[in-house]
């Protein structure tokens, strides 16, 4: 009588992870997401490890989660994984008040972002 299971949205050779409500603007997060797009996961992890961007640690956690999902939930080979998609979405924006001179006030916007990373298993024969 319950709901039927929805069909899998991703192909069988893909897995994904989503990080929501990251406290960074989408533009800044997209700089880091753009850096790992299309690369092998070990190369992407190394680049995130030595990146000087503050948000790169959160992106690294999300990528590690996608790798773990691929290995544990979908039985994919970790050595053949490639970051097929890494895209950023806008979440909410907190609006704060900053008191200024002469009784005025200024608005401070604190944006949040969502990050989705999709990894795909690419066999060596397909890559060559």
UniProtKB/Swiss-Prot annotation:
InterPro entries: Ribosomal_uL22, Ribosomal_uL22_bac/chlpt-type, Ribosomal_uL22_bac/org-type, Ribosomal_uL22_CS, Ribosomal_uL22_sf. It comes from the Bacteria. GO terms for cellular component: cytosolic large ribosomal subunit. The keyword DNA-binding does not apply. One of its GO terms (biological process) is translation. The keyword RNA-binding applies. Keywords: Ribonucleoprotein, Ribosomal protein, RNA-binding, rRNA-binding. Belongs to the universal ribosomal protein uL22 family. This is Large ribosomal subunit protein uL22. It comes from Methylobacterium radiotolerans (strain ATCC 27329 / DSM 1819 / JCM 2831 / NBRC 15690 / NCIMB 10815 / 0-1). The lineage of its organism: Bacteria, Pseudomonadati, Pseudomonadota, Alphaproteobacteria, Hyphomicrobiales. The gene is rplV.
